[in-house]
Structures are given as C-alpha cells and as structure tokens.
A protein has these predicted regions:
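PRPP-associated nucleotide enzymes
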Residues: 1-223
C-alpha cells in the first residue's frame, strides 16, 4: 500500500524511483504521462518528475471498492472487475501521445483488451507502455495470483517465437540480448501499442534500495 513501509523502505518512494529509472532510460516524445490506477500512479508520477513530461489522469478509478483485478482465479471475473473499475477521460486522451505506466504486465489480457482498448477508443494518438517492473518469467511461489508458467505474457511470447515451451529461458532473461528484444516486440504487437519498454531488473533493485540478496527475485530470474 502506498503509505506502507517494508524493511524501512517507503512503498510510494520505491514506486516513484522505479518510474524515474524508466524515464532516465527513455527518449520517447509524449504529451503526458499517466498511470493505471491505483498501483501505476506512483510509478507514473516518478516518471513525470524525472522526465519533465506532465502527469495527467487519462484513466480514473470508478470506486475504491473494486479490488485488484488480476487476482481472481477466473479470467471472466478479472475482466469484469477491470472493466467496471476504470473510466477513460476522453477530453484528456483524445489526440494525444500517452506514456502509460503500470506496476507490471502479468498475463497482458486486461491491459490489451480493456486498458489499451479504452485509450484507443477515446482517441489516443500514440500509446507507449512502461511497466515498472521487469518481464515476469516465472509464477510466484508464495501467492496464487499466477499458477502456471504458460499464462504469463512473456512465456506466451517465447512459446510463439520458439514454437514450443522452454523450461528455463535463460537467453530471454538478458535484457541486452536479441531474443529478449524479440520477446518484447512480440508482446508490443500483441498488446497493439506504439512502444513497450520494461524496467531493467538492476534498476528495480536500485530503486527499492535493498541489496539483491535481500529480495525475492524468483518471478524474474527463477531463483
């Protein structure tokens, strides 16, 4: 939660720093930065402050009564919650080049079919997606929000590129590699966005402010 602290690290501060790192590695020209509420807002504010690009609310949450839309086990329930809780502000979106920050891309289904669609439907000129965490490669071993490797957006991309399942996609973990770039471009095309750039894992660790050996990195590295 934004007002929480873990191991002495402010959640909101870490989110803003993640957004700032995204901005420092970016060179996109845009009219404004926006966040997918609620968890993407802190990242977007950090991006806006670091880049000098103004922050605007392209999407607003209908009510704080809706919970995290990616956690229900059934896809139809996840889609329903996501549809009901987000409203697009057309007067802000129409005709503009938008950088949209979210906390992560898990499956990519809600981002593609709901969030991105709402932005295009309301007249976005360009959509540049900036997830404030690295590509998720492995299901979480502590929660049930993701249960299988195959449901993750990155693994769907790898399966499409390789024509088969890969047990440990080591070549795709290196964000400097050609295979990593092809994976990101596959996801970009699948999402139907102008550009897609993830936060690098080293930048995420630096933004959090704790040593890597004190963080669980299983979702990204598988260890």
């Amino acid at each position: 939660y934004p007002s929480s602290s873990y191991e002495g690290i402010s959640v909101e501060g870490a989110r803003e720093r993640c957004g700032a790192y995204l901005a420092k590695r970016d060179n996109i020209q845009a009219d404004f930065v926006s966040g997918v509420p609620d968890s993407g807002v802190g990242h977007a504010l950090g991006y806006a402050m670091a880049s000098g690009i103004p922050y605007r609310r392209a999407l607003v949450k209908y009510t704080p009564g809706y919970g995290r839309s990616y956690t229900p086990p059934a896809q139809e329930i996840r889609d329903l919650v996501a549809t009901m809780k987000l409203c697009a502000v057309r007067v802000v979106i129409n005709g503009n080049r938008i950088i949209i920050c979210d906390d992560s891309i898990v499956r990519g289904t809600q981002l593609k079919n709901l969030t991105i669609k709402k932005l295009w439907d309301n007249g976005a000129k360009e959509i540049h997606v900036r997830p404030a965490c690295p590509p998720l490669m492995f299901p979480c071993i502590y929660t049930s929000s993701t249960r299988t490797t195959g449901e993750l957006a990155c693994r769907k991309a790898i399966r499409a590129l390789e024509g088969k399942e890969i047990e440990h996609p080591s070549e795709y973990l290196d964000h400097h590699s050609e295979k990593h770039a092809k994976m990101i471009d596959w996801i970009r095309r699948d999402l139907n966005v102008t550009s897609l750039k993830y936060l690098a894992i080293d930048d995420m660790i630096a933004a959090i402010g704790l040593p890597a050996d004190q963080l669980c990195l299983h979702c990204w590295l598988g260890k």
